Amino acid sequence: KAGILWAIGEDRKNSYESFISSRKALTYETRDNIPNYEKRPKPLAYQHPLSPEESLKYTQVPVGWSLKLFASEPQIVNPIGLAWDEGGRLWAAETVDYPNEIKAERKGDDKIKILEDTNGDGRCDKVTVFADGLNIPTSLTFGNGGVYVHHAAETLFLKDTDGDDKADIREVVLRGWGTGDTHAGPSNLRYGLDNEIWGTVGYSSFSNDGNRFGSGVYRFTKDGSSLEFLHQFNNNTWGLGLNNEGDVFGSTANNNPSFFCGIPATILPGRKGLSAKMVASSSTFHPITPNIRQVDVFGGYTAAAGHAFANSDNFPESWRGKRAFVAGPTGNLLGMFDTSRDGAGYKSRNAFQLVASADEWFSPVAAEIGPDGNLWISDWYNFIIQHNPTPNDNRGGYAAKNGKGNAHINPNRDRQHGRIYRLVWDEAPKSKINSLGEASNEELLRALGDSNQFWRITAQRLLVDGKKTEIAKSLRALVGKPGIGAIHALWTLDGLGKLDSDTHRNALLSTNPVLRRNAVRALPLDASGVDLIFQSGVINDPDLTTRLAAFVALAQFPTSEPVKNAVTSLGNDEVNQKDEWLSAALDAAGKKHQAEEFSDLEYQESEENLLGNVNWKVSIHSGNGAQHLRPTKEGIKGGKCLKIESKKPTDTSWGAEVKVKANTRYRLRGKIKTEGIQGGGLGALFNVHELQSPERVKTQALRGKKDWTEVSIDFNSLGRKEIT
């Protein structure tokens, strides 16, 4: 520090020291119930909250950027989700009931609020409660003339019918979201390019009418008549984003901050296979205060949230459409990841952080591009972020209890603060659009080509929901023009039911690979779609991500000899064989159409015992009192073994991280002995932690008293190079 201050010169040093002395000093007190998972000599003290103005003085952004307050308490408290209507007004989900106040009949104290800046000074000056009586709403998005809200166990559709900004209609669109853990439920609602509603869910899962899934990405039609699980992640999912090309990404809250979603799980046999892959180069983050508290993955994205892209011109050119923003609330920061093509898929480089604070309450949980083209940040502003595992004497430093939401009960959780900021680049242009609320058809048509993805999707939504079929001719003309508007014109025609075969064929033959890719994704899954795909040549597209989309389409077409022969022929292509995404999609297509086996694509079984010399570690997911032992004479024939015993209910394990080859078939095998295993849990078993939902990779489970019993499970490592 002294060297830096010397190097910057006397004037800047004086400026720095003046700024530091002007800040309100952080103040602390000693309190109980501060988890100490890091096993510091003593738990951290409780920092008192700061005003928004003082908090900003402890928060860093890059040179050339400004963090500007839009709203704060009492205007908004505990903001968990952000969305904007066609008028450019911010809507926020506010939840003081999170995480444990699950109310009877789900009538709670939470709200959907509209926050407006009516005088153009950049600050909220009008707050309207659109809907109240909610209980832990986690996300919202617009469609069908109203707003969709995740309100587990339901997804609601709310609509104002008389123009007073109050919800007059409240309908249930979906039922079945799990409520066993409130931070693992549904979130991240988005209006998709395909005119359906997309979202994510964690391990609380969805289950209704035989449709069960969890920890990943799904979509549903606006009326809720169809719900599809599309991309399997490996744990609690709380991030979703679309780049300008329509490719899908996400993040999970367990050290996996950037996933690419390459293949829909609907085409994979038994929904098992490579549908999504963690592509981040590193999950490490870099707080600017040592006083961070985490439950696991110390120093990394253990609570990653969001994956919005810099999809506007309000960012440096090298960022646009490529850089994603991922929140890390346990590190008091907002991180960045640079995505780039990697074969048919993507890779994602950890690009450090964009915002970081030494205020220990600063807790960004959502970051989205707003109608002004800038990055808006939802600051939960809370000293306690951790949900679970529940602290116990050995892990966390004291014995806590879980509440109804499966979060540890903690009197230090705050229900009085919340902030929403805008991050503004000094060189950002002013938005060309302020509102599409009263826009004409011509204005909506022009907005399909706006530089801000928000306005493009909003215009598309309004045209489709408004059934504006009278502009189909203009939309077809736009598909034939260069620029990003062609993609949205294509999907608008599709949503209106006006995408004719000639327009579709021309899009498939376009010189723009992104338009070709989206045209493939819009193909009808019938004989007409088969004709279009074979007329276009996209199954051999030089753009490998577009080729991947074509292979996915092949796997969804009805079986026919032309399709079967094409899949067999494509399997002999060396490029297709070597690319993990292309080979996985072809493998799914081959199984669907019973095409000839691709010898070069068959998985090679490993004969080596990868568990012979590993570092076994203890994990306690819930419950207290378990002992983890390494007896030397209680194993088979008096040998060594690993042992867990507990007098109380617990979810715990011995685990080891193992390096594996991607797309390789393995067998997990061992022997288990049990005594007195009872209760409502699964029992004693082996499993692969990253492959546990919707159908867990797990062995037979033993309960009661059983002598040494061999159990095993065969599985595929998919795109993973390390498993637990």
Name each model-derived stretch.
Residues 1-444, 455-458, 462-464:
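Beta-propeller domains with acidic blade repeats across secreted/periplasmic ectodomains
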Residues 441, 472, 500-501, 531, ...:
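Core helices of alpha-solenoid repeat scaffolds
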Residues 312, 329, 338-342, 359, ...:
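Hydrophobic alpha-helix feature that most strongly marks membrane-spanning transmembrane helices
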Residues 596-724:
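Extracellular and organelle-lumenal recognition/adhesion modules and their flexible linkers in secreted
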Residues 442-449, 476-480, 504-509, 534-540, ...:
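HEAT/HEAT-like alpha-solenoid repeats
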Residues 431-434, 454-467, 484-498, 503-509, ...:
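Structural detector for internal amphipathic alpha-helices that build alpha-solenoid repeat scaffolds
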